Amino acid sequence: MNIPKPADSTWTDDQWNAIVSTGQDILVAAAAGSGKTAVLVERMIRKITAEENPIDVDRLLVVTFTNASAAEMKHRIAEALEKELVQRPGSLHIRRQLSLLNRASISTLHSFCLQVLKKYYYLIDLDPGFRIADQTEGELIGDEVLDELFEDEYAKGEKAFFELVDRYTTDRHDLDLQFLVKQVYEYSRSHPNPEAWLESFVHLYDVSEKSAIEELPFYQYVKEDIAMVLNGAKEKLLRALELTKAPGGPAPRADNFLDDLAQIDELIQHQDDFSELYKRVPAVSFKRAKAVKGDEFDPALLDEATDLRNGAKKLLEKLKTDYFTRSPEQHLKSLAEMKPVIETLVQLVISYGKRFEAAKQEKSIIDFSDLEHYCLAILTAENDKGEREPSEAARFYQEQFHEVLVDEYQDTNLVQESILQLVTSGPEETGNLFMVGDVKQSIYRFRLAEPLLFLSKYKRFTESGEGTGRKIDLNKNFRSRADILDSTNFLFKQLMGGKIGEVDYDEQAELKLGAAYPDNDETETELLLIDNAEDTDASEEAEELETVQFEAKAIAKEIRKLISSPFKVYDGKKKTHRNIQYRDIVILLRSMPWAPQIMEELRAQGIPVYANLTSGYFEAVEVAVALSVLKVIDNPYQDIPLASVLRSPIVGADENELSLIRLENKKAPYYEAMKDYLAAGDRSDELYQKLNTFYGHLQKWRAFSKNHSVSELIWEVYRDTKYMDYVGGMPGGKQRQANLRVLYDRARQYESTAFRGLFRFLRFIERMQERGDDLGTARALSEQEDVVRLMTIHSSKGLEFPVVFVAGLGRNFNMMDLNKSYLLDKELGFGTKYIHPQLRISYPTLPLIAMKKKMRRELLSEELRVLYVALTRAKEKLFLIGSCKDHQKQLAKWQASASQTDWLLPEFDRYQARTYLDFIGPALARHRDLGDLAGVPAHADISGHPARFAVQMIHSYDLLDDDLEERMEEKSERLEAIRRGEPVPGSFAFDEKAREQLSWTYPHQEVTQIRTKQSVSEIKRKREYEDEYSGRAPVKPADGSILYRRPAFMMKKGLTAAEKGTAMHTVMQHIPLSHVPSIEEAEQTVHRLYEKELLTEEQKDAIDIEEIVQFFHTEIGGQLIGAKWKDREIPFSLALPAKEIYPDAHEADEPLLVQGIIDCLYETEDGLYLLDYKSDRIEGKFQHGFEGAAPILKKRYETQIQLYTKAVEQIAKTKVKGCALYFFDGGHILTL
């Protein structure tokens, strides 16, 4: 039913239709800023206040995504009802609605489920006194249940269980398998029928050698991937072929490219036949490239064409590696062999689920997942045929609710959808379900939201609604200026499609201008691209600073410009411009690890900033000390917590005093040593007094803890130690006190759980830390203050800001999950590697590969939607900030797609994206503003789009100019003071005598620096030949005052070259040497080292995988792999006379102990060889390349290699046949 829109209505036609349409299920696709909440509220108000047949507000079920949204909606409805009451003061119906509003069903779906459980608990034998468990409490119960289950399974001793254990555990423990069981269980809970879903994915492995791979349920995704890769290879070769036709192009190579294309086309013709591809893909051979010589050929075009052809080769090699290293029969056999293992896993998960549920019922608790599943159980009943159908309870709600309205429908999951279908009445064409959402803003896949539910209805429903539901598009944006909308549309028309993005960004999806802003020429979207290449000749400070600091400096610079200009923002309520304030600005990040550094930089530049950090609480010193006190109370025989407490302000012992305690008893636990000190100590001794007071408190607290709650104990500790008062007097005291109060509050919350006691509380906290569930530092600053906001993109959803900075666009997407040995998918189930514990081999099965490809598309689609949410938060000005290693290379990479005539960029190019810049860059390369900069003409229809961009290419060292100017200004002030005869500022005025004393040096200093035990690296540094390329210089006295310089902790940031070298060495130490590793295998090695905490995240990101793999393709790499004996990281100690190392030493015959670690030794038929890896920068550092570098590098490292050789020959009694240095940069080998 449609009601005509009044002539004076301010609603758009689409909004009006969304407000008044009835009679069927309605899906409203509401774009960002389109006023969907206002439409939703207006629809409810009109139903409640209609003059004919009004309904009561409690006959509406309104489902929101958050409690805050529900509260806001109730508030808006109350305001509207109160206004209506002013117009109709005698209306009893309106007064009734105001009284009913508080108990109206306007809430999250979890809250509605809770209502259902409280009303119908008896239908499922649920204890009516149940409570909702804390997440950590639930996990602790689950851990206990899992431990008991595994103990029982081990006791049974069944072969099937041990087969499972052998495949998914390490030699040391079975925690990996326990984690797998819990993960599969929790994932299954996103399905309406978890057990049925678990049992269904066994069918993936229910095959025989006669099965057709093409008919298996996962093959659709294998087929799509093969087609995409082949088309991607073809696209590269077509681009290369086009280059041969260009002026100066490599025309002789045309025949090569045509032959290559013919082979690719042959594969494309058979891309649906896996068996045929198994025969054909390995047989593809790219012929030797024809020579291109002569001045008429452009070397740049030749290089570009060569790179494109090499790229196509790599794609085919990857295709072969992924799918065709094993025959179809071998693939099927692997699946069949894994089937019994998967069946055992499924039964183990089901057993765990039943035990876990029983344990929770015993304690009368439920979790959020139980809320939905118990509600679903209440709303369904089994009929005579054994089928599930709506129960009496469901029919009650169907009659109760006149309409069910769902906000943020794109974030609904399968269980929630099932519940909604059970409380609504009728099929889609006559239903009463009203859904509002925007699939382009579905960014909660990690919470198992299912955007395909929205998409399937959007494709099925029609604008007329005939025979099905009705869809209504709200695409007018009332939030942002035209420049913001144009920029967003320009990017997403090229990036978002059905395969990657999961929605076509067509005319219906485009944002249309709905807001009326006065003209402003300064609102174009700005891209700040920061080049922090390490091989630049910039200062060491520029090389040392991390990417985050450069971006923070760039942001701070732009904020200062906005505030000082000042930039004008439009106040819509007052209909006038005003000066921008800090509170008008937000900085958005994908995640918060960068937040502390950005806040530090902004504050250093005088910019107030606020972030609601969700981490850092447990690292706060005052919290760590308080937890150490509790650990000591629980068990004083814990040395580290006890030392922490003694060193803290609570006791106040210094390092020397801690040593005195340890000397009292060197072998006993530290607690015993402390008691011995007290027993033997001098009662007038200050340390004795400190320890005696603490010991008395400790005994009191231990006794107190036995009869009081943990929260009472914490408060007793605060009171006895006055620690709360102490931290209040420290810098940031208000924040520190708030942190201590949070710990007390957390203890009180813990006491409402099923657990009791101090030991359990400490385990409770440890569990939170293991899970990464940091409490976040307590809020001590109001969000209403005039400060710049810093938040995640997810936190910003639903908010708007006049000026938005989207930072960290060069950070890699988190694809870690794709590297696991197993994956879970709602549609396909469980994909795993084939694992043979006896043969110690494993490799991906086809279901695992299919899921990996499918999930990569889904992850990229999610990242596109996250980017869309970020861009659409801006009202007036948008800044995009990202960093790269070399912007010229980056531009060249982006230009590859510039000549495309279709709006949507090629699927394969988008599939390769690893960062937001990989999305944004190629799209911007086709815009006139960046296209001119890149030097590549784009298609006129695309480059002529009205979007306006301002692109800045910034070198990292340019961002340090402000600091340099500040230092120069300070120096000028000192010189001016001297000229005027005035005192030099105090921090630089030195008494001559003090200067003389501080500058005194010991006359025989060189003798003191020769230690009896030295490392090879120390000896090398002292004897090494210094050169202009080494990047080092001999130590010399500082000229002028050392206080003129910044302290080291402010200078040094990020990984040094040595630290990066160490990371590369770590990989070379652990990478398998049985065969030439692939890129993927090397990446897996790096990932494994990171998981084992042998590499930090920063080191992992610094490793150049291609440089690692390149080594194994060299002659020396081949020798190493084929060697009959090899060993790595070999430590040695060797005593040598000092004169052999330092010819001028005073004590020439004094023995020195030389220690070192040899990177690699290997033995071939010829003899023993010594190999050392080097991470020196070679390319671009020497005028004549490696030829010029060789003698310098040989001189630099000859001492080190001589000592290594001497050590091997003396210790192993074997002559070293040869020595070599391998330089990762450029893949150069230097024999010595």
From Swiss-Prot:
Job of this protein: An essential component of the DNA double-stranded break repair machinery, the heterodimer acts both as a highly processive, ATP-dependent DNA helicase and an ATP-dependent, dual-direction single-stranded exonuclease. Recognizes the B.subtilis Chi site (5'-AGCGG-3') which transforms the enzyme from a helicase which degrades both DNA strands to one with only 5' -> 3' exonuclease activity. This generates a double-stranded DNA with a protruding 3'-terminated single-stranded tail suitable for the initiation of homologous recombination (Chi fragment).
Top-level taxon: Bacteria
The protein, known as: ATP-dependent helicase/nuclease subunit A
InterPro entries: AddA, DNA_helicase_UvrD-like_C, DNA_helicase_UvrD/REP, P-loop_NTPase, PDDEXK-like_dom_sf, PDDEXK_AddAB-type, Restrct_endonuc-II-like, UvrD-like_ATP-bd
Cofactor(s) essential for the protein: Mg(2+)
Catalyzed reactions per annotation: Couples ATP hydrolysis with the unwinding of duplex DNA by translocating in the 3'-5' direction; ATP + H2O = ADP + phosphate + H(+)
Consequence of substituting D1172A: Loss of 3'-5' nuclease activity, helicase and DNA-binding are unaltered. No production of Chi fragments
Keywords, comma-separated and alphabetical: ATP-binding, DNA damage, DNA repair, DNA-binding, Exonuclease, Helicase, Hydrolase, Isomerase, Nuclease, Nucleotide-binding
Alphabetized HAMAP family for the sequence: AddA (MF_01451)
Effect of K36A: Loss of helicase and nuclease activity. DNA-binding is unaltered. Dramatically decreases ATPase activity, kcat for ATP hydrolysis is 4.64 min(-1), loss of helicase activity
More details: This enzyme is a functional homolog of the E.coli RecBCD enzyme; unlike the RecBCD enzyme it degrades both duplex strands symmetrically.
Subunit relationships: Heterodimer of AddA and AddB.
PROSITE patterns: UVRD_HELICASE_ATP_BIND (PS51198), UVRD_HELICASE_CTER (PS51217)
